[in-house]
């Protein structure tokens, strides 16, 4: 297992973080750290989540996050980012 860092841009709406954390809970993915804040565009928030897993876990997390309505962009942050 390795450390995976996922960065996303989401709608600046109530309950977006709740839906994201609920997806992690339903899939039994454990969030190690989470940070959220307003992006340059005030209608968008930036959320960064770290977790531990393999490539399959990473792929599943990204696919599930991309299905959420208020999630605009999802990507893995690599060490060189």
List the model feature ranges, each with a label.
Residues 1-81:
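A conserved regulatory-domain signal marking ACT and ACT-like small-molecule sensing domains
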């Amino acid at each position: 297992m390795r450390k995976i860092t996922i960065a996303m841009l989401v709608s600046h709406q109530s309950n977006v973080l709740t839906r994201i954390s609920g997806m992690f809970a339903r899939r039994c993915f454990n969030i190690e750290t989470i940070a959220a804040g307003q992006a340059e565009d005030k209608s968008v928030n930036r959320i960064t989540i770290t977790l531990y897993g393999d490539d399959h876990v990473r792929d599943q997390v990204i696919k599930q996050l991309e299905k959420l309505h208020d999630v605009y962009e999802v990507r893995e942050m690599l060490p060189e980012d």
